From Swiss-Prot:
Belongs to the asparaginase 1 family. GatD subfamily. CDD domains: GatD. The gene is gatD. The lineage of its organism: Archaea, Methanobacteriati, Methanobacteriota, Methanomada group, Methanopyri. Its EC number is 6.3.5.-. The keyword Flavoprotein does not apply. The active site is at T107, T185, D186, K264. This is Glutamyl-tRNA(Gln) amidotransferase subunit D. It catalyses: L-glutamyl-tRNA(Gln) + L-glutamine + ATP + H2O = L-glutaminyl-tRNA(Gln) + L-glutamate + ADP + phosphate + H(+). InterPro entries: AsnA_fam, Asp/glu_Ase-like_sf, Asparaginase/glutaminase-like, Asparaginase/glutaminase_AS1, Asparaginase/glutaminase_AS2, Asparaginase_C, GatD, GatD_N. The keyword Disulfide bond does not apply.
Length: 458
């Protein structure tokens, strides 16, 4: 019998009684009649001894409480899954572009760790090719590095800076055409915005890529997303930070979004990322994974600059993002004022409004030298604080219009701007200046169609 991977206590005893181990196929009947069938997965050392984890045929993992198992049987032999990196050296192809690939801890190109039961990123060139062999026909991975190992919700400004430094280092190599960054999807848009502002003089594409479903799932989007991202990075045509993810639910096309106009708009769909009131820079046809085809959808993207990129500043962390809701106490603003915050981004309603009851707290914040920026919860459309009375009152006390910036982009930008200057007039000037394509200004039409409309099927 194979060795159990961290199954202890009740769960370990039950499996031993039935002669079962990790990798065996099992059929479990629960006390309520629910049947679970699949492969026994390892149990993490951090897990309890009350559950048995099973990977079902649909790719999902489910934990079954031991005290609810009425029947346990083995319908057939399973197998303990394994992962093998490519053996031997990867042959360099001078006809292919050179790309640096970085990992920050997302599920892109992940494999199952059968000691902990978790998914771990493949971050050496051999591991990446072992996970996605089609990469050999698309790029040369001349540099593969694990920059961070974080769930994206744990990202902080110091991590954005670490990634930025690694990007600048990679693109300082004249042989590298572009950089691909594997990143968790939940806060990918924040990181994309941060890199867009803090790196100046990009001499090649920087492409953030993720996966809504890890590569141990049959429905994983990891391979096609990674190949599309690498193809776009290797193309070397764009000098911007971008995000490359599924264009729609099938595996036909990935879209490349501008890093300051993109948002995760769905919790679980593979096409969760959308360019908001903007058109993606390009689409990548990945029906043939070994021969992805790039089609540009707009021509106003920034071209790579000559020379080497550089870090242009940092991020002031004493900045808050506050979403207004009816009945919400303005004391939330006083909290940040009392704690010495330097900036507040408001997500207001409609054209940029909050309750008039908030005016006193907002005026107090402005009088204390705090930059207060207004964005809209609507996401689509532009803040206009000159139309209605509330907007004019807010403008009169010193609230800065956030134009048509997405709230999270305005949040990151304000952190960046406040790191550069304390002068509130200069803060307003910079916040209303288009630095990295974050302010479209209504110049792009066709960004408001429903998901199944013509924009979505670009």
């Amino acid at each position: 019998m194979r060795v159990l991977s961290e199954y202890k206590g009740k769960a370990g005893e039950l499996l031993r009684e039935h002669g079962l181990s990790v990798g065996d196929r099992v059929r479990i009947v629960r006390d309520d009649g629910v049947v679970v069938e699949g492969i026994i997965m390892p149990r993490s050392e951090l897990g309890d001894d009350e559950h048995i984890v099973v990977k079902m045929d649909n790719g999902y993992n489910v934990g079954v409480r031991v005290d609810r198992i009425e029947k346990l049987e083995a319908p057939g032999e399973g197998h303990e899954p394994s992962f093998k990196p490519m053996e031997g050296e990867i042959e360099y192809d001078p006809k292919l572009p050179n790309v640096s690939v970085m990992s920050t801890g997302g599920t892109i190109a992940c494999r199952v760790d059968y000691e902990t039961g978790a998914v771990k990123p493949a971050f050496t060139a051999e591991e990446l090719v072992g996970a996605v062999p089609e990469l050999l026909d698309v790029i040369n991975i001349v540099d593969a590095r694990a920059v961070l190992d974080l769930l994206s919700e744990n990202m902080e400004p110091k991590h954005w800076m670490k990634i930025a430094e690694e990007v600048v280092d990679a693109l300082s190599d004249p042989d590298v055409e572009g950089v691909v960054i594997g990143h968790g999807t939940d806060t990918m848009a924040f990181t994309a915005a941060a890199l867009s502002f803090v790196i100046e003089g990009l001499n090649g594409p920087v492409v953030l890529v993720g996966a809504q479903r890890s590569s141990d799932r049959p429905s994983s989007d990891a391979a096609s997303n990674l190949i599309a991202a690498c193809a776009f990075a290797g193309d070397g045509e764009v000098g911007e930070v971008t995000v490359c993810m599924h264009g729609w639910t099938s595996d036909e096309v990935c879209l490349v979004h501008r890093g300051v106009r993109v948002r995760k708009m769905h919790t679980s769909r593979r096409d969760a990322f959308r360019s908001v009131e903007s058109i993606p820079i390009a689409k990548v046809d990945v029906k043939d994974l070994r021969n992805p085809k790039i089609e540009f959808l707009r021509s106003d993207y920034r071209r790579p600059e000559d020379g080497e990129p550089e870090i242009s500043g940092g991020f002031e962390e004493k900045v808050a993002l506050v979403k207004f809701a009816p009945g919400m106490d303005p004391e939330v603003l006083d909290f940040y004022v009392d704690r010495g915050y330097r900036g507040i981004v408001l997500e207001g309603t409609g054209l940029g409004h909050v309750s008039e009851q908030w005016l006193e707290s907002i005026e107090r914040a402005v009088d204390d030298g705090i930059a207060v920026v207004m964005t809209s919860q609507c996401l689509y459309g532009r803040v206009n604080m000159n139309v209605y009375r509330t907007g004019r009152l807010l403008r009169a006390v010193g609230v800065i219009p956030g134009e048509d910036m997405l709230p999270e982009v305005a949040y990151v930008k304000l952190m960046y701007v406040l790191d550069r200057t304390d002068d509130i007039k200069e803060v307003e000037r910079l916040m209303r200046t288009n630095i990295a394509g974050e302010i479209e200004g209504g110049r792009v039409l066709g960004g408001f169609e429903p998901a199944d409309g013509p924009h979505h099927r670009l």
